[in-house]
Amino acid sequence: IRLTTKEKWLEEGRPEGTIPRTADMFRWPEGGGVLMLDYDPPPDGIPLNREDLVSALRRAVPGLCDAAMLWWPSASSFIINTETGQQVRGLRGQRLYILVANASDIPRAGKAFTEALWAAGSAYFAVSTSGSLLSRTIFDGSVWQTNRLDFAAGAACRAPLRQERGEPVLVPGA
Protein backbone atom coordinates (compact mmCIF):
# COMPACT_ATOMS: atom_id res chain seq x y z
CA ILE A 1 0.00 0.00 0.00
CA ARG A 2 1.27 3.46 -0.90
CA LEU A 3 0.64 6.50 1.28
CA THR A 4 -0.22 9.88 -0.14
CA THR A 5 -1.93 13.12 0.84
CA LYS A 6 -5.72 13.21 0.99
CA GLU A 7 -5.77 15.93 -1.66
CA LYS A 8 -3.69 13.89 -4.12
CA TRP A 9 -5.65 10.71 -3.35
CA LEU A 10 -8.94 12.46 -4.19
CA GLU A 11 -7.46 14.14 -7.29
CA GLU A 12 -6.34 10.74 -8.59
CA GLY A 13 -9.79 9.22 -8.05
CA ARG A 14 -8.97 7.16 -4.95
CA PRO A 15 -6.61 4.75 -6.72
CA GLU A 16 -6.48 1.14 -5.58
CA GLY A 17 -3.44 0.29 -3.46
CA THR A 18 -3.09 3.89 -2.25
CA ILE A 19 -4.50 5.52 0.87
CA PRO A 20 -4.19 8.98 2.37
CA ARG A 21 -2.32 9.33 5.65
CA THR A 22 -5.38 10.53 7.55
CA ALA A 23 -6.66 9.37 10.92
CA ASP A 24 -9.85 7.93 9.43
CA MET A 25 -7.81 5.48 7.31
CA PHE A 26 -5.92 3.95 10.24
CA ARG A 27 -6.88 2.31 13.51
CA TRP A 28 -5.14 0.77 16.47
CA PRO A 29 -5.69 -2.98 16.41
CA GLU A 30 -7.42 -4.89 19.19
CA GLY A 31 -4.80 -7.12 20.77
CA GLY A 32 -1.06 -6.83 21.17
CA GLY A 33 0.98 -3.97 19.80
CA VAL A 34 3.87 -1.62 20.40
CA LEU A 35 3.67 1.71 22.21
CA MET A 36 6.31 4.09 20.87
CA LEU A 37 7.56 6.99 22.98
CA ASP A 38 9.37 9.72 21.04
CA TYR A 39 11.79 11.95 22.95
CA ASP A 40 13.24 15.05 21.31
CA PRO A 41 15.11 17.46 23.57
CA PRO A 42 14.50 21.19 23.23
CA PRO A 43 16.66 22.55 20.36
CA ASP A 44 18.90 24.48 22.74
CA GLY A 45 18.80 21.91 25.55
CA ILE A 46 21.11 19.14 26.64
CA PRO A 47 19.48 15.78 25.86
CA LEU A 48 18.77 13.25 28.57
CA ASN A 49 20.86 10.10 28.34
CA ARG A 50 19.17 6.69 28.14
CA GLU A 51 19.23 6.06 31.89
CA ASP A 52 17.84 9.49 32.78
CA LEU A 53 15.13 9.23 30.12
CA VAL A 54 13.94 5.83 31.36
CA SER A 55 14.14 7.05 34.99
CA ALA A 56 12.03 10.13 34.19
CA LEU A 57 9.41 7.93 32.55
CA ARG A 58 9.32 5.43 35.40
CA ARG A 59 9.18 8.19 38.04
CA ALA A 60 6.13 9.63 36.31
CA VAL A 61 4.54 6.26 35.52
CA PRO A 62 5.63 3.82 38.28
CA GLY A 63 3.60 1.04 36.68
CA LEU A 64 6.32 0.88 34.00
CA CYS A 65 9.06 -0.01 36.49
CA ASP A 66 8.43 -3.70 35.79
CA ALA A 67 8.10 -3.24 32.04
CA ALA A 68 10.96 -4.10 29.73
CA MET A 69 11.41 -1.66 26.87
CA LEU A 70 13.57 -1.23 23.82
CA TRP A 71 15.64 1.97 23.53
CA TRP A 72 17.15 3.30 20.32
CA PRO A 73 18.46 6.69 19.23
CA SER A 74 16.38 8.52 16.63
CA ALA A 75 17.43 9.23 13.06
CA SER A 76 18.67 12.63 14.28
CA SER A 77 21.38 11.11 16.50
CA PHE A 78 25.00 9.99 16.18
CA ILE A 79 26.14 11.41 12.85
CA ILE A 80 29.91 11.28 12.30
CA ASN A 81 32.31 12.56 9.65
CA THR A 82 34.23 9.46 8.56
CA GLU A 83 37.09 11.54 7.11
CA THR A 84 37.83 13.41 10.33
CA GLY A 85 36.31 11.06 12.90
CA GLN A 86 34.44 14.07 14.30
CA GLN A 87 31.02 13.49 15.77
CA VAL A 88 28.90 16.05 13.92
CA ARG A 89 25.87 15.29 16.05
CA GLY A 90 25.73 13.25 19.22
CA LEU A 91 22.76 11.80 21.05
CA ARG A 92 19.61 13.85 20.44
CA GLY A 93 16.25 12.22 19.80
CA GLN A 94 15.46 8.82 21.25
CA ARG A 95 12.72 6.21 21.09
CA LEU A 96 11.37 3.81 23.68
CA TYR A 97 9.25 0.87 22.54
CA ILE A 98 7.00 -0.98 24.99
CA LEU A 99 4.92 -4.07 24.21
CA VAL A 100 1.26 -3.62 25.13
CA ALA A 101 -1.54 -6.18 25.46
CA ASN A 102 -4.13 -4.01 23.68
CA ALA A 103 -2.89 -1.54 21.09
CA SER A 104 -6.32 0.09 20.86
CA ASP A 105 -5.61 1.45 24.36
CA ILE A 106 -2.55 3.43 23.21
CA PRO A 107 -4.37 6.80 22.85
CA ARG A 108 -5.80 6.51 26.39
CA ALA A 109 -2.43 5.42 27.78
CA GLY A 110 -0.73 8.31 25.99
CA LYS A 111 -3.14 10.78 27.57
CA ALA A 112 -2.51 9.23 31.00
CA PHE A 113 1.27 9.42 30.42
CA THR A 114 0.94 13.10 29.52
CA GLU A 115 -0.94 13.84 32.75
CA ALA A 116 1.56 11.83 34.80
CA LEU A 117 4.53 13.58 33.18
CA TRP A 118 3.02 16.98 34.02
CA ALA A 119 2.45 15.88 37.62
CA ALA A 120 6.07 14.65 37.84
CA GLY A 121 7.51 17.92 36.50
CA SER A 122 8.61 16.43 33.16
CA ALA A 123 6.59 18.89 31.09
CA TYR A 124 6.73 22.53 30.07
CA PHE A 125 5.16 25.19 27.90
CA ALA A 126 6.89 26.23 24.69
CA VAL A 127 6.05 29.47 22.93
CA SER A 128 5.10 29.20 19.26
CA THR A 129 6.26 31.70 16.65
CA SER A 130 2.81 33.33 16.89
CA GLY A 131 3.14 33.65 20.67
CA SER A 132 0.79 30.82 21.65
CA LEU A 133 1.64 28.55 24.57
CA LEU A 134 2.21 24.94 23.51
CA SER A 135 1.86 22.21 26.12
CA ARG A 136 4.83 19.81 25.90
CA THR A 137 6.17 16.85 27.85
CA ILE A 138 9.45 15.04 27.41
CA PHE A 139 7.61 12.72 24.98
CA ASP A 140 5.83 13.84 21.82
CA GLY A 141 2.14 13.15 22.36
CA SER A 142 1.28 13.37 18.67
CA VAL A 143 2.77 9.91 18.01
CA TRP A 144 -0.19 8.28 19.74
CA GLN A 145 -2.41 9.19 16.79
CA THR A 146 -3.12 6.30 14.43
CA ASN A 147 -1.78 8.05 11.33
CA ARG A 148 1.61 9.01 12.77
CA LEU A 149 4.57 7.15 11.36
CA ASP A 150 7.74 6.16 13.19
CA PHE A 151 10.66 7.17 11.00
CA ALA A 152 12.93 4.58 12.58
CA ALA A 153 15.13 3.62 9.65
CA GLY A 154 17.88 6.13 10.41
CA ALA A 155 19.39 9.03 8.56
CA ALA A 156 20.23 8.94 4.86
CA CYS A 157 23.77 10.32 4.91
CA ARG A 158 26.14 11.16 2.08
CA ALA A 159 29.88 10.58 2.33
CA PRO A 160 31.76 11.50 4.34
CA LEU A 161 28.87 11.50 6.84
CA ARG A 162 27.62 8.28 8.37
CA GLN A 163 25.21 7.42 11.14
CA GLU A 164 26.44 5.16 13.93
CA ARG A 165 23.47 4.57 16.21
CA GLY A 166 24.53 1.09 17.20
CA GLU A 167 21.99 -1.60 18.00
CA PRO A 168 18.77 -1.15 19.98
CA VAL A 169 19.22 -1.69 23.73
CA LEU A 170 16.84 -3.81 25.78
CA VAL A 171 16.08 -2.00 29.04
CA PRO A 172 14.93 -4.65 31.53
CA GLY A 173 12.04 -4.21 33.91
CA ALA A 174 12.66 -4.34 37.65
Model-derived segments and their meaning:
Residues 1-94, 98-120:
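Signature for HUH/AEP ssDNA processing cores
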Residues 117-174:
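Catalytic "initiation/cleavage/transfer" segments centered on a nucleophilic residue
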